[in-house]
């Protein structure tokens, strides 16, 4: 982004440099923006005129059927609900990987394209709120967090019973 701001990178003309999507929507109105201009109107849109997102991923939330109990988690709020679902959680060891989820669990409605959550994360207050939500989970005597960094670890943690729920990579 700095390289774009400093004129070191080439700026895209989205409609000239990229063809329309399979649905016929021109590039400047596409890029997962729901028809809003990705450079000016979309809150979670393109970070600069010199960059195009090329990776789309999701997080998997899993639980151990044998240790979770009769009630099963159904929402991201359940991941943080240690009264209803006591036990440790397995969370990826990255300071930013869990912030969106924490805000959703704390009551911020995602909005179209996650707009409300990303608006909150653009503020110091929103980031602090997300971090506090994760810290509360990790320090909860009914809960706690086990941080992982290798993709095979979440299933291992679940199978061993060390955690009752875990996040995992989608691939």
Model region roles, listed by residue range:
Residues 1-157:
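Extracytoplasmic ligand-binding site segments that recognize negatively charged/polar headgroups
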